[in-house]
Swiss-Prot record:
Disruption phenotype: No visible phenotype. The gene is WDR5B. This is COMPASS-like H3K4 histone methylase component WDR5B. InterPro entries: G-protein_beta_WD-40_rep, WD40/YVTN_repeat-like_dom_sf, WD40_repeat_CS, WD40_repeat_dom_sf, WD40_rpt, WD_LIS1/nudF_dynein_reg. Gene3D superfamilies: YVTN repeat-like/Quinoprotein amine dehydrogenase. It comes from Arabidopsis thaliana (Mouse-ear cress).
């Protein structure tokens, strides 16, 4: 089990620190997160960790070809899903928290029941290379996937059929995400571009970034759908206004030059940007002020994925090959 003191952050903010939120005016004092629990169960790098939308479950996916379902109340292992013949790069939850979908290097996606008997309900075949990223639309009748074959595919959940294939990028696709009403898809790619697509027509509506380098490693819509968080492999996170296409905020201080590390919006208590990092830490920034509020230490390898609990002030993070653990962090009451 990783050490790292007792998991408290002793970098930017510690137990006695308020970050730089201050105490004057109506700005709340920043309350630090502390290490709550370490989950062990995977035998290789954990590529993705995500809380269910109802907050009752946590799912993790790994290079070890399995996905694990955990209780998000006591963090016990509920079920281990097996079936992929290669490592899993990403997972997604349906809006009702009843189903998950996994994206694998075996060129398939699998839809799983998150309820007993935890069966594989569908295998989605069509990609011709590693499937790297996946997401459900809000009604959860469609799934979007991105692959090293440079295409985006949209799948019908009920039938498992591919209903649209978009030749989206000129290099592997690192991220795909629907907006809040399911009308738009944002995609990111190693070709240095980030694009917005009409989900129904499959047409490109806007290109947010079109640089040859650095690679765009992650992109997702904000909860209100007005902004897009974009990560690039020059250790930079940017917040873009979708309507204008302009970048409003830049977040730096973490290390991200190699892996497609996920980031997230934390909105349960204050508005934060949360990201993993290749220096084995989890970083939290104030969304508006852009300053680092806290660095969570404890993992023993790069932090590849982070997820924020939808209701509780909790964060989950997952580690690369040398770590192989999930750490749960809880904010002081």
């Amino acid at each position: 089990m990783p050490s790292g003191g007792n998991g408290t952050s002793n970098g930017v903010a510690n137990a006695n620190s308020t970050g730089n939120a201050g105490t004057s005016g109506n700005v709340p004092i920043y309350k630090p997160y502390r290490h709550l629990k370490t989950l062990e169960g995977h035998t290789a790098a954990i590529s993705c960790v995500k809380f269910s939308n109802d907050g009752n479950l946590l799912a993790s996916a790994s290079v070890d070809k399995t996905m694990i379902l955990w209780s998000a109340t006591n963090y016990s292992l509920i079920h281990r899903y097996e079936g992929h013949s290669s490592g899993i790069s990403d997972l997604a939850w349906s809006s009702d928290s009843h189903y998950t979908c996994s994206a694998s290097d075996d060129c398939t996606l699998r839809i799983w029941d998150a309820r007993s008997p935890y069966e594989c309900l569908k295998v989605l075949r069509g990609h011709t290379n590693f499937v790297f990223c996946v997401n459900f639309n809000p009604p959860s009748n469609l799934i979007v996937s991105g692959s090293f074959d440079e295409t985006i595919r949209i799948w019908e959940v009920k039938t498992g059929k591919c209903v649209r294939m978009i030749k989206a990028h000129s290099m592997p696709i690192s991220s795909v995400h629907f907006n809040r009403d399911g009308s738009l898809i944002v995609s990111a790619s190693h070709d240095g571009s980030c694009k917005i697509w009409d989900a129904k027509e499959g047409t490109c509506l806007k290109t947010l970034i079109d640089d040859k380098s650095p690679a765009v490693s992650f992109a997702k819509f904000s909860p209100n759908g007005k902004f897009i968080l974009v990560a690039t492999l020059d250790s930079t996170l940017k917040l873009s206004n979708y309507a204008t296409g302009k970048f409003l905020k830049v977040y730096t201080g973490h290390t991200n030059k190699v892996f497609c590390i996920t980031s997230a919006f934390s909105v349960t208590n204050g508005k934060y940007i949360v990201s993993g990092s290749e220096d084995n830490c989890v970083y939290l920034w104030d969304l508006q002020a852009r300053n680092i509020l806290q660095r969570l230490e404890g993992h023993t390898d790069a932090v590849i994925s982070v997820s924020c609990h939808p209701v509780q002030n909790e964060i989950s993070s997952s580690g690369n090959h040398l770590d192989k653990t999930i750490r749960i962090w809880k904010q002081d009451a």
